[in-house]
C-alpha cells in the first residue's frame, strides 16, 4: 500500500497561501497536517512554504524546514510562494538564503509561474528540479444584466508597500473626481499606516475613498462585480491569487505588461486587460474602461487555465512521480520491471539452455583457451551449447578435441571483410538455447561467467546483460595454464588497465541501474547476453557493419529503444587477451571516424549527429492533428516543430492533403497520414490544437527524460510525448498480461503531466499573419 502524500500547511486560515494549500489538498484527496511534529516519518510530504508562515524571520523559517528534513525519512516536495526578488529591498539577502536552504531539502520544487522559476534560477548556483504549476482559476462567473457597477476603481487584496495603491491613486488624476477608489481587503499586519496615508491622499485630492476590510468568500464575487474598473497594479508580482480572483468573478482586470502577465496571457488568452507598465498606461486604460465597460468583463466562453481540477491533476501527477513502481509478474513466474529497475527482478533457479556464440577469425590458439574455460563453467555442461561462427578464415577452426566435453558446432561465412555482426547473427541462427551468450574468441571467461551473465535474464526476459571484460597478457599461455589459474593453483597473467570510460560509466550508473538513452555506449558485444526471443525480435545485429566496432553500440541502442533492460554484471568476468584498443594504439582517429559515420545514420543520439544533416531515421516523429487548423495556422505549428533539426512531421485529419498541397514543395520532412514503424526513433510526439513550439521547446521536452509526457498548452492544445522504449515494452507484454498497452505504459513508466509555459510552448491563432 502506497502512503498518500500529506500536505503540511501552517498559518492562519484566511492567509492566501494557507487557503490555496488547503484547497489543493482537498482537490488531490490528500491529508492535511498543521504542524511538522505531527507528520508520520515514513509518509511523503508536500510543504506549502513562504518564510512569513514558518518563522518570525527568514532564517528561523529555513531552520524549521531543515529540522524537518533531517528527521523525515520519506520524499519531500515543496511549493514555494512569495519567491525572493530584488524588490524585497533589505530583506532580499536573508530571504534568498532561506529559500536556497529550503530548496536543498526538497526532491522537487514547485513554483506558480515560469517567472518565479527564472527568479529562483537567478539566485541559485545549482539547477534543481523546479516545476511550474500555475495557481488555479475558478471558471468565470457570468455577467448579470442586473449588476450596475459603481463608478469606482477597485484593487483587491491586502494593503502593503509596493503593491501599487499609491500609483493607482495618482493615475486617477485624469479621471473625474466623482470616480471613487475602493480597496477590497484590509491592511497587512503592521502596515495600517499605508492605509491611513492612502485615505489622507484621497481626501486631499477630493476623491471618494473606501475600504471593505475582510470580505467573506460568499460575498466577494458580488463585491468585485460591483466595481467599474478592476485593477491589479502590483508591478513586482510573480504569481497572483488576486488577479485570479478577479477573473473568477467574471472580471477582466487591468494589469501592467510584464513577464508574469505575459505568461498568464499565454495560459489564458484575453482573460486580462494588459496595458503598458507605466502610470500613464494605467491612466489611459482606466479611462477607456469607464468609456467601454464591456471590456472589463470576461467573454462568455472564457476558460482560463488552469482550472482547480486541472491544477489538481498536475499536482497528482507530480506526486505519482515520486512513488516507486512495482515489478509485474508474468504467468510463467518471470517478471517485467518498470523503467530499468533490474534490481526488482525475482531470484530465478531454473537453468535453461544457453547458446554461447563465438565469432572467430584465424584465432585457433585463443579459441582453444576460450573453449577450455567453457569446459569449466559452473552452469551445467548439459545446458550449454557452443557455436563458433567463423568469419571466413582460410582454415576451419579445429574443435574436435572439445567434442566430448562440449556440445559444439561450427558455422562459417565467406571472407567479405571484417563482419563480426553478420558472424554473430549466423551463430545465433544455429542456436537451440533460450539464452544467447556472446563471447569473443580472444576473451576467456571465468568459471562462473555464464552463471553470472544469464541468471538475471532467466528472471527478466527484457534484460540485456554485459559482463566485465578485463584485460591480460595471455600470450604463451596454454590450456593447462588456464586450468591451474582458475582452480587457484597458479597466479594469473599480467593484467592490463581496464578502460576508464567503461569503469566510470558503470560506476556512475550503478551498473546501469540508472541507464538512460545514452547508456548503449557501455554495452560491448564481447561479453553480452540476452534471450534468444528478444534477439530475434530485434532482428539481431546489423549485418551491414563491415570493419571493427560500432555494431554493439547500434544493437544496444536499438535494444534500449525497444524496451530492453540494460544491466552490467560485474561478477561475470572474462579476460581479453591484450590491452583495450585505445590502450594498444593510443586511439585511431580514422577508425573511430569510420565507426561514427556508420553509426550516425543508425542511432538517434544527438551526440552522434552534430554535423547539421538530416537522416531518414529521425530522432523524433511528430504527428499533428489538423482539427481546428487553417492551412496558415497548420504551417506555423509544423514549422515551429521542425526547428528541432532531427524531426519528421506527419499531418493527419480534416484538410491535411489540401493544406499540404497549398504549401507546395516545402520541406520534404513533412508528410500526410500516419508514420509507419517508429520503433527506432526515440519518441513519437502527438500535437493537438493551435500549438506553437519555441526555439528550444522540443529539446526541453525530450530532456525531461519522461517516457510518457502530457503537456497542456493552456486550453488551446496538448502535446503528448511517448518514447519508443515505453511503447515497445508495453506492446511486447500486453497480450500476455491481458492489459491494454496504454495502461501498461503507465504501469511500467509512469506518466508525467506538465504545463506548456515551462517548455516554451504557446497558443497560436487560427489565422496568423503570414503576409509581408
Model-predicted segments: where are they?
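A conserved mid-protein helix/loop that constitutes part of the nucleotide-sugar donor-binding site
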Residues: 19, 160-174, 193, 244
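Short aromatic/hydrophobic "clamp" motif used to bind/position activated sugar donors
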Residues: 436, 684-686
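Glycine-rich, basic loop-to-helix element that forms the pyrophosphate-binding segment
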Residues: 413-431, 480, 669-677
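A charged, aromatic-enriched C-terminal amphipathic alpha-helix characteristic of glycosyltransferases
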Residues: 277, 291-324
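Acidic donor-binding segment of Leloir-type glycosyltransferases
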Residues: 373-416, 642-670
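N-proximal low-complexity "stem/linker" segments adjacent to membrane-targeting elements
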Residues: 325-376, 600-632, 765, 772
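Nucleotide-activated donor-binding/catalytic signature segment of Leloir-type glycosyltransferases, i.e.
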Residues: 195-221, 403-408, 668-669
